[in-house]
UniProtKB/Swiss-Prot annotation:
Name the UniProt record assigns to this protein: Ubiquinone/menaquinone biosynthesis C-methyltransferase UbiE
Catalyzed reactions per annotation: a 2-demethylmenaquinol + S-adenosyl-L-methionine = a menaquinol + S-adenosyl-L-homocysteine + H(+); a 2-methoxy-6-(all-trans-polyprenyl)benzene-1,4-diol + S-adenosyl-L-methionine = a 5-methoxy-2-methyl-3-(all-trans-polyprenyl)benzene-1,4-diol + S-adenosyl-L-homocysteine + H(+)
Source organism, top-level taxon: Bacteria
Binding residue positions for S-adenosyl-L-methionine: 59, 84, 123
Any GO MF annotation of the entry: 2-methoxy-6-polyprenyl-1,4-benzoquinol methyltransferase activity
Group of enzyme by EC: transferase
UniProt cross-references to HAMAP family, sorted A to Z: MenG_UbiE_methyltr
GO biological process terms held by the UniProt record: menaquinone biosynthetic process; methylation
Biological role: Methyltransferase required for the conversion of demethylmenaquinol (DMKH2) to menaquinol (MKH2) and the conversion of 2-polyprenyl-6-methoxy-1,4-benzoquinol (DDMQH2) to 2-polyprenyl-3-methyl-6-methoxy-1,4-benzoquinol (DMQH2).
Keywords linked to the UniProt accession: Menaquinone biosynthesis, Methyltransferase, S-adenosyl-L-methionine, Transferase, Ubiquinone biosynthesis
EC number in record: 2.1.1.163, 2.1.1.201
């Protein structure tokens, strides 16, 4: 089994408990991070009528937050799609949001027309994409000119110190144990800190975005550097 297939199968296995684990392990902060990202994009992008796709959508958390943010910011979502390669995750998403279109596909091969989207989001998923540069090129392809890409991700820390040490201790020692109890799959939650350590720094990822045809509009770090928000415009 190839690396990408193993990652997808891991998410299939933890899908039934994924939402519960996320809320507990992040102390609910992941919802706040997503809301801030969606509202920031809505404030930057002036169009009122929007076509949105959420990539690596998982169980659909961002779908709901996009809908709530559009209502709050007086925007109109013409179409919103959730795309994920995990059938387990999509099964949960479809139960939660029966009126939303969900598509089984990987980020590196999107079944979407070129220049068909205003906004594309991917939350805590880009580090799980093996062919990351290919995925970023796909994001550029399906976005309209001046369309917005928003990425939420756990990036490799660039600084040391007490807070960084606490973060590392939690990720490597506490999170896998709690996640394992909730999901009965400890190895899946041991993968999380390893995948963060194997990912890019903020500067490295911004360079990849530029190389894929994007211009950075905004960056923000949440919760002492635990989570990063990247907002970029397609050139």
């Amino acid at each position: 089994m190839q690396k990408q297939e193993k990652i997808i199968e891991m998410f299939n296995q933890i899908a039934p408990t994924y939402d519960k684990a996320n809320r507990i392990l992040s102390f609910g902060a992941d919802v706040a991070w997503r809301k801030k990202a969606c509202q920031r994009v809505m404030s930057l992008y002036l169009k009122k009528d929007l076509k949105i796709a959420d990539i690596a959508c998982g169980t659909g958390d961002m779908i709901e937050i996009w809908q709530e943010s559009a209502l709050k910011m007086e925007k109109n979502i013409l179409n919103i799609k959730g795309i994920d390669p995990s059938s387990g995750m999509l099964n949960v998403a479809k139960e939660k949001f029966p009126n939303v279109e969900f598509i089984k596909a990987g980020a590196q091969n999107l079944p979407l027309e070129s220049q068909s989207l205003d906004i594309l989001s991917i939350s805590y998923g880009i580090r799980n994409v093996v062919e990351r540069q290919k995925a970023l090129s796909e994001f550029a392809r399906v976005l309209q000119k001046d369309g917005i890409l928003v990425v939420l991700e756990f990036t490799k820390r660039e600084k040391g110190g007490f807070i960084a040490a606490c973060r590392d201790f939690y990720l490597k020692n506490i999170l896998p144990s709690i996640g394992g109890i909730i999901s009965k799959n400890k190895s899946a939650y041991e993968y999380l800190p390893n995948s963060i350590e194997g990912f890019l720094s903020k500067k490295e990822f911004i360079l990849e975005l530029k190389n894929a045809g994007f211009e950075m509009l905004d960056y923000k770090s949440f919760s002492f550097g635990v989570s990063s928000m990247f907002i970029a415009k397609k050139l």
